[in-house]
Amino acid sequence: MNKIVVLTGPTASGKSSLSIQMAQRLNGEIVSADSMQIYRNLDVGTAKVTKEEQNIVPHHLIDIVDLTANYSVGDFIIAADKVIADIISRGKLPIIVGGTGLYVKALLGFQELEYAASDTEEVHKLNAYELDKLVVELKSLDINRAQKVDLKNKQRVIRAIQIAKYGKKDAKLTQRPKYDALVIGLDWPRELLYERINHRVTQMVQDGVLKEAQTILDAGGEKLQSGKAIGYKEFFPYLRDQVTLDKAINQLQQDSRRYAKRQLTYLRHQIPGLVWLKGQTAELRLTEMIEGWLSLK
């Protein structure tokens, strides 16, 4: 199997900066495994690497869809497999970087998924319908599938309708390892991680996250997949003059800390073979660890 390196961990753990250093030293290219960095023009709230950083090392699967688009795990796997194959064909090392645990798990082959390729135009049409009507349509198409889907989650109902309509596009991601992967997680003492998260949120406000949140709100707000993300939805009440900015900031800090805790729990229980490194000293050990692993046949 082809070798890849995966660098994961909770939000604000330092994955992006460390991955750039790794890629420079190991002749690698970075493949984002972040479910929000796929969106164009959402840079601050997603903690996306800068254009200058992207010029230092090639980054893939960043800025690939509009902020109104839906994007599934299946879409990610299709795109990531193609990018990884291309990187390997050019003699470089694919370095997968991101904290979206389901993306990582599925890419490694430990998650069986059923998916249909996204049809953006149809998704827009389906989004215009009320949830009740979508549920009725899904039940009429495939009652068995309807019984397995969270019927209160509009996006999952829409995805189920797509799969039910286009059975020929269904596919199974087999539950077996697809790559020879070294999977590394960055771990921080909770107090330090929370400090980093709180600081990041403050910096995001200074860097213009409110402008991005307003753009999402104008395009549909919570109705959009991008509008449900931590980092933007917390500012919608402020932009609607319902709460103060301080309250919105505090809410985002709290939501981000809770999200980090969930990320850690998921990664520890769902990703087989993950090796944890202390975030404070990971840079000192990482390159040597990877070089030793790459030398193994």
From Swiss-Prot:
Binding site for ATP: 9-16
GO terms assigned for molecular function: ATP binding; tRNA dimethylallyltransferase activity
Catalytic activity: adenosine(37) in tRNA + dimethylallyl diphosphate = N(6)-dimethylallyladenosine(37) in tRNA + diphosphate
Binding, substrate: 11-16
Keywords attached to this entry: ATP-binding, Magnesium, Nucleotide-binding, Transferase, tRNA processing
First-level EC class: transferase
Cofactor(s) for this UniProt protein: Mg(2+)
InterPro entries: Dimethylallyltransferase, IPT, P-loop_NTPase
Coiled coil spans: none
UniProt record, GO biological process: tRNA modification
Listed EC numbers: 2.5.1.75
Pfam families xrefs: IPPT
Annotated positions for site Interaction with substrate tRNA: 100
Gene3D superfamilies: 1.10.20.140, P-loop containing nucleotide triphosphate hydrolases
Positions of the UniProt region annotated as Interaction with substrate tRNA: 34-37, 155-159
Family of this protein: Belongs to the IPP transferase family.
Described purpose of this protein according to its UniProt entry: Catalyzes the transfer of a dimethylallyl group onto the adenine at position 37 in tRNAs that read codons beginning with uridine, leading to the formation of N6-(dimethylallyl)adenosine (i(6)A).
PANTHER family from the UniProt entry: TRNA DIMETHYLALLYLTRANSFERASE
NCBIfam families with a match to the protein in the record: miaA
The protein, known as: tRNA dimethylallyltransferase
Organism for this UniProt entry: Leuconostoc mesenteroides subsp. mesenteroides (strain ATCC 8293 / DSM 20343 / BCRC 11652 / CCM 1803 / JCM 6124 / NCDO 523 / NBRC 100496 / NCIMB 8023 / NCTC 12954 / NRRL B-1118 / 37Y)
